[in-house]
């Protein structure tokens, strides 16, 4: 991938950009095999990759500069701002949005937040695009609601320029810390969720719900999990750390009982909406802590699917699963180091299948799907 920002030394986020994709995949596979070297693996499936540029469905832009000359991008460690509107990881459809947002910020009088001075209002612009219909969700992260009336007043102009903006919100993040969003979300549009579709499964994206940033590879990840589950004798499963329900909604069949658990209420609202659309009445999604939910249960289903954050599922949940011994565990991980650590805490299981998903090209990061079977 060619990147003018990298070539000019202005951005180093894609540290592996000079390596061809096959070399990147080889290095990631070697890393994964090294992490799982202590465990016999029955089958190594071929790694899955997608486009090497234009693949991201989300932009998280730090807003800096001035009202008249706004920069959207990032801050270097020394506080120097860098405009990343030309980042080749973003699809071409993002460019006109960034171009319209800069004059809109001036029209609405949204002073960019100055980290050094702790002054200003507009901290971040968060943009998400649906692959299914091209609709977009735009979130303005503000320090306070002081400029809210001005923003609302200027909004018709933005809608006129960008009719693809289906969901627009203001998020209030009042603290002087590098935190992307606060708890308060104010909707400026009637529509509150962005419609997405992977493999004919309807998914919904709401402002404060996690959603994969590489749709091409994520859809293959979900489809693979579905194919693995269909090969197993499973009538009842848990989907822990389920997010908007991507895994569970793909894996469920009309006669299967499934419980999806996720701590974020916004994500659970999305999952419930999808299940209703699919007419799957035996799916139950609850906004709870996954570990607390699981360890409080006196029995387990045949299959437990886990998709934890980078920290992994942790020892308490590993101990519970070891004791309760579901027949199958499918572990989807964005951090193979913590996954390997967790598998060490599940001594009664063998690894039947492993597959790497290159969700983050040009970096050392990757996702991995692992099927564990009770010995």
UniProtKB/Swiss-Prot annotation:
* One Gene Ontology biological process: rRNA base methylation
Q: Which CDD domains match?
A: AdoMet_MTases
Question: Does this entry carry the keyword Signal?
Answer: no
Q: Which HAMAP family match?
A: 23SrRNA_methyltr_RlmC
Q: Which residues cross the membrane?
A: none
Q: Which InterPro entries match?
A: 23SrRNA_MeTrfase_RlmC, MeTrfase_TrmA_AS, MeTrfase_TrmA_CS, SAM-dependent_MTases_sf, U5_MeTrfase_fam
Write the Enzyme Commission number(s) for this entry: 2.1.1.189
Please state which protein family the record places this protein in. Belongs to the class I-like SAM-binding methyltransferase superfamily. RNA M5U methyltransferase family. RlmC subfamily.
**Which Pfam families does the annotation name?**
tRNA_U5-meth_tr (PF05958)
Any idea which positions bind [4Fe-4S] cluster? 3, 11, 14, 87
* Entry annotation: catalytic residues: 334 (nucleophile)
Q: Which gene encodes it?
A: rlmC
Q: What is this protein called?
A: 23S rRNA (uracil(747)-C(5))-methyltransferase RlmC
């Amino acid at each position: 991938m060619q990147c003018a920002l990298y070539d000019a030394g202005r951005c180093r986020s894609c540290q592996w950009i000079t390596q061809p994709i096959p070399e990147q995949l080889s290095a990631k596979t070697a890393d994964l095999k090294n992490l799982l070297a202590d465990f016999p693996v029955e089958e190594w499936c071929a790694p899955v990759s997608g486009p090497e540029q234009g693949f991201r469905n989300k932009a998280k832009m730090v807003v800096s500069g001035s009202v008249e000359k706004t920069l959207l991008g990032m801050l270097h460690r020394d506080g120097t701002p860098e405009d990343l509107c030309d980042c080749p990881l973003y699809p071409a459809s993002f460019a006109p949005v960034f171009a319209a947002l800069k004059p809109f910020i001036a029209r609405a009088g949204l002073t960019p937040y100055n980290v050094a001075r702790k002054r200003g209002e507009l901290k971040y612009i968060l943009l998400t695009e649906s692959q299914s219909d091209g609709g977009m969700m735009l979130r303005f992260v503000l320090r306070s609601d002081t400029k809210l009336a001005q923003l609302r007043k200027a909004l018709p102009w933005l809608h006129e320029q960008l009719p693809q903006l289906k969901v627009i919100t203001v998020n209030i993040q009042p603290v002087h810390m590098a935190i992307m969003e606060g708890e308060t979300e104010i909707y400026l549009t009637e529509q509150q969720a962005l419609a997405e579709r992977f493999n004919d499964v309807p998914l919904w994206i709401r402002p404060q719900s996690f959603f994969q940033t590489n749709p091409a590879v994520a859809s293959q990840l979900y489809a693979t999990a579905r194919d693995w589950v269909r090969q197993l004798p499973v009538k009842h499963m848990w989907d822990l750390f389920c997010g908007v329900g991507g895994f569970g909604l793909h894996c469920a069949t009309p006669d299967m009982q499934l419980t999806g658990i996720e701590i974020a209420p916004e994500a659970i609202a999305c999952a419930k909406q999808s299940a209703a659309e699919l007419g799957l009445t035996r799916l139950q999604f609850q906004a709870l802590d996954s570990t607390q939910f699981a360890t409080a249960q006196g029995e387990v289903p045949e299959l437990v699917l886990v998709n934890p954050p980078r920290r992994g599922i942790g020892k308490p949940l590993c101990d519970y699963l070891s004791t309760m011994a579901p027949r199958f565990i499918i572990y989807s991980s964005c951090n193979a180091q913590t996954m390997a650590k967790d598998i060490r805490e599940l001594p009664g299981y063998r690894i039947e299948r492993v597959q790497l998903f290159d969700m983050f090209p040009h970096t050392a990061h990757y996702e991995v799907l692992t099927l564990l079977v009770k010995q």
